[in-house]
């Protein structure tokens, strides 16, 4: 991240601003006081879950970047379940909403894995296109059949009942979605590194042909990894509805799924490393408004910093083992063959 911060400083300097001041405001806006910490942690909660949507399939050898689609469909499922029946306005009803959100995301991303395994469709392209499809479906239902008549200039679904909402952690402005994200990262890390099925997933991701030779069901494992990742992103959408927005509206389409891609790559697809990286990126997002107020730069400029971090990660992957690689010793020169001496025959 130091390289990304340095490049961001150059970017600020080119705009005739002080890089040192920008770095200072980044830290203050993200982690300068308890209020900043709360803002950073709240922003980090959905990033943990959307990053898992990339990290878990990546461990199975798939590059899935469609977490945004699973997130918006998860939010739509959470807000749409009360249209089908009235869930009890208590913790059990909230669990039903979150389960519906997770199932919606799981099915959507599992479709990506199935297309890859049974139709040979590239998962990167299909997941991205399905994300756009999910956003279109979301807009159709929110602005059409599920629109609340009371929502005027900002179409949304009906507001969830108070008993179905997820409150904040006592004494803080942080909602319980942060706990969901941390627990999901910890549990999936334990599953990935300490269970037989997690080990099989890593084998498939490392060498699919070798996994097939030893009898591992590669197709089922890959689709299952996609379903787990999709469930995490769908849960993120459900938590955004139940804990933040109270309904499904256009605010869900905020790019959290795409930022989760950056978080996962910076964390090297390690579920445990996702936690601190998500907090860091959440802090960058929280510091954007402070940069805008103090330095008169767009708050979206922090996305440039995120982009630099992503580019450096990709560059390090591409150049690993190639830059400054130790030179192989030159082979010793082969001595030239000596002519065989001709022995003169003795005169008879």
What are these regions (language model features)?
Residues 1-13, 50-54, 75-81, 102-107, ...:
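Hydrophobic core segments of alpha-helical transmembrane domains in multi-pass membrane transport
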Residues 8-15, 25, 30-85, 98, ...:
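Single transmembrane alpha-helix segments in multi-pass membrane proteins
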Residues 87, 107, 170-247, 271-272, ...:
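Helix-loop-helix "hairpin" substructures at the membrane interface of multi-pass membrane proteins
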